[in-house]
């Protein structure tokens, strides 16, 4: 996150320090380049794996201020990418081969962290808006609805008056409205994980917050078949002692259960999906070395299994997880490793890609598309990238 506070406001300075720490944490102390196969002469061969195509998009002179946080498949077989360039919200629509069809820039001082195509063919996206009127100005949640061409139908920013608020994920619910999750009322020390529901015209329907410690955040969100909501993130303190956090709420946002677990070192969840048997599988990092972490909770919130890969080097966490059509799960982590596991999280294969570490998608033919790229060297941006490969080449 690129919050740029100045003007001598202490709370803003605290928030800047907090978000600098969050960038280091959530985007993984990134002082490396995602690995390339040094022995491959073919640029579409990565660690011996044929990559069917690789597309990159650049909107700044050296990509240093380009960000891409989320990639989703669209109903026409193409893809939608959410991010920012030069601190301006960005959506990119591609065809099924990853070629750009259009892009749209939005309000200055915005970043889009999540996007999904919705039932009318348009898109819902969310992130934050950082106003540039100082002093007395704090980051707010930004929510944006576009048509199928990316033109704005409505957008709005909202939050607490004197503290910081931002959204990490958004979904369309079964009734055609939208729910977001993220952080609410962050003063640099205390914060709340939140769920907020908005109508399909942008009106607030309800808002709920959840805490298990002084600092709490929601990172990812899903709706269950019966209409309940699952959010995952962390609960702990602003500057360490992170515990993985999962909340189940009903369709009105009322808490059904809330689970926070202590661990050796920090633990945090970035992504969640439904297990085919009805449980909830979440991914993130664990322990003081911030290695990759998976766990499953059943519908009552009890842990079915968990895997903290402490024998691995520090991969700094899985950022996305999806069920595999052949059983098990696909994941992408901070160091650009695409991993497949079985149904209980045991690794089947793991291969290092390049320039992609945020989102993973399985296509109808079994191919995998991976895209999005978090902060790189010196907490700057990087190439906005998306690639397609055949995972059977490494199974």
Model-derived features with residue positions:
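Intrinsic-disorder-associated, low-complexity terminal segments enriched in Asp/Asn/His/Tyr and depleted
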Residues: 9-10, 14
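Intrinsically disordered, low-complexity serine/threonine-rich segments
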Residues: 6-8, 30-31, 71, 344
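A sequence-level/structural motif corresponding to short, flexible coil/turn segments enriched
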Residues: 35-395
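Bacterial Sec-dependent N-terminal signal peptides
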Residues: 4, 15-48
């Amino acid at each position: 996150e690129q919050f740029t506070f100045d003007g001598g406001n202490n709370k803003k300075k605290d928030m800047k320090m907090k978000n600098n720490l969050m960038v280091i944490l959530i985007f993984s102390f990134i002082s490396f380049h995602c690995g390339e196969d040094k022995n491959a002469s073919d640029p579409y061969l990565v660690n011996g794996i044929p990559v069917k195509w690789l597309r990159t998009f650049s909107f700044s002179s050296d990509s240093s201020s380009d960000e891409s946080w989320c990639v989703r498949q669209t109903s026409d077989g193409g893809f939608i990418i959410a991010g920012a360039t030069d601190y301006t919200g960005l959506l990119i629509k591609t065809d099924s081969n990853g070629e750009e069809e259009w892009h749209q820039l939005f309000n200055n001082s915005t970043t889009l962290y999540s996007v999904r195509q919705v039932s009318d063919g348009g898109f819902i996206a969310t992130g934050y808006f950082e106003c540039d009127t100082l002093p007395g100005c704090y980051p707010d949640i930004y929510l944006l609805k576009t048509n199928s061409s990316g033109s704005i139908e409505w957008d709005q920013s909202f939050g607490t008056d004197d503290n910081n608020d931002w959204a990490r994920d958004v979904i369309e619910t079964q009734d055609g409205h939208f729910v977001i999750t993220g952080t609410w009322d962050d003063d640099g020390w205390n914060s709340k994980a939140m769920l907020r529901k908005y109508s399909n015209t942008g009106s607030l329907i309800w808002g709920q917050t959840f805490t298990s410690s002084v600092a709490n955040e929601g990172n990812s969100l899903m709706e269950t078949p019966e209409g309940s909501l699952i959010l995952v993130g962390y609960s702990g303190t602003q500057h360490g002692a992170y515990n993985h956090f999962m909340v189940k709420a009903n369709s009105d946002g009322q808490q059904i259960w809330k689970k926070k677990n202590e661990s050796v070192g920090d633990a945090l969840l970035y992504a969640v999906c439904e297990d085919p048997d009805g449980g909830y599988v979440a991914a993130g990092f664990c322990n003081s070395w911030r290695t990759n972490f998976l766990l499953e909770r059943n519908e009552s919130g009890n842990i079915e299994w968990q895997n903290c890969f402490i024998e691995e080097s520090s991969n700094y966490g899985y950022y996305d997880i999806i069920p595999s059509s052949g059983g098990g799960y696909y994941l992408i982590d901070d160091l650009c490793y695409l991993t497949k596991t079985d149904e209980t999280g045991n690794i089947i294969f793991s291969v290092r890609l390049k320039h992609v570490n945020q989102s993973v998608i399985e296509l109808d033919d079994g191919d995998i598309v991976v895209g999005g790229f978090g902060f790189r060297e010196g907490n700057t941006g990087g190439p906005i990238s998306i690639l397609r490969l055949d995972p059977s080449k490494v199974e």
